[in-house]
């Protein structure tokens, strides 16, 4: 009998070990409207830790006071087999946004996502350049999982049998409301680690949630003023003379140009890289950079971080690199201080000290076929998947610190990022080239604290060329990337004048763009964002399918898809931009509540309604809120220098009174962090 008791006790203990222990989460407030909870034992290596975030505390004071969201008490976590699962409740008709840089969808409820840094492959499945594990609810809260692992997210997919909202079984033979995706009342997230750190953000609005996230991550980047001008990336094997001639041609043709990007041929070896100048194409790098600066044009350098055996730092870097190579180049273990210092010193010595203004850091995302495998090891002890998830953060942080210590701002490009990168001076790009999907990515970037450029590379027609250019001037970085095509703004002579008009418009609007990035930094408001964050926006007006025949209570995902607006967005405080794509003659635009006016003519266009417009080839639809005040400067070819005065033209739209806060600082240094900046109130009564 005693032996039987022992067996029973042992059996009970085994069952307890097999069954995951579920528990509510204790929440600790870390910033106003932001709470942190812990399940199990989270790994020390995390996204926010790698990003080295310092919250922008002053910005929180300008947000509404809030209390812990009620759903906090319903969030549960459990640990089984060394993995952590989290369950966050959902309400009917609640919509989800975010989960990183998606290219084809804005609404994420109903998705199954594997959040994994990778080059985007044409499907919104979680594998993307910035798989940020942060989402925003239409109910006015947000959730961030601070883990550097590959996460699996069931964003309202999967129904528990013990749920009080469990769907009812239906007979597919006879019931037309049967669906293959029954109603799910929760987001479930699997973290492959024995613990997880979860952040909960209160609103009350979705925009407030986004702002709190951005402020927690240090506030948005404030680029140098020249970074908001126009940039051209040259062909791969251009020489110093080729670059100078191209800059001269921009000047002669009257096209603006603030910085030029040099592609792989500037290096003595690339793929993998030496980080050293090619002596035949650039015999005098310092003189070349100096000459370009004298023309008012800065230099940005392409690179990837993989070290060639021919690089002078190869031997020193070898012991602090990973076990596997990329294109036969070693991979610096940037999680280790020594590898970072070796790389930083090399970049500083070869580039920054002679006046190079920034970097384009390529191929830190994937593809799997060439990047290190998940079996790779690194001297720091960081797992290969964690390094994959954070390598984009490391290259941004490392290069940004190079300029920060010189009190010099930079603005560049990167192909991978993740949570915590909001304050880094980098814009994401890729090798994909769908114009409509590029706009959807621009829309989604505002949910995740990253920036994206719908860059122009090449086109098969003058129409496509112009349409892409019209879009890119209303984005974080106005750029032609001609590394392979050799295209220039005037490549299609039949639309050269229209291209020039939009290029000059970009320059004229620099006071507006600069002020909007200041709001991004100080207040966390993304300068380019989805309509879903705009007050008074009603996606019902964007319905593209009849819903009367659908049982939306059982299939809310159908409702979400039918109301998705993914081809128009807000640019700054006042502008609604609706791009046109090749072959389009007309399009619909959904206007939020309030009077809206045509950006070009000032004419009234509508209020809280869906309109159909036929703008012609010379224009894309851009609309302005009633009462808006927009600051313009005179058209010019280069951004103003520090201390340079410019004449402003102030435009007021509509009939309502309005105001605008115009931001100013030296445009080049970090002195604004010490209070060296000003806001000027522009008021129309």
Region locations from a protein language model:
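Positively charged n-region of N-terminal signal peptides that target proteins for export
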Residues: 1-7
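Bacterial N-terminal signal peptides
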Residues: 10-17
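Sec/Tat signal peptide C-region and signal peptidase I cleavage site
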Residues: 19-23
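Catalytic-domain carbohydrate-binding cleft regions of carbohydrate-active enzymes
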Residues: 24-618, 664-669
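Generic hydrophobic, helix-prone segments enriched in Leu/Val/Ile
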Residues: 2, 143, 212-214, 317, ...
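Accessory, solvent-exposed terminal regions and/or long lumenal/extracellular loops of proteins
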Residues: 624-682
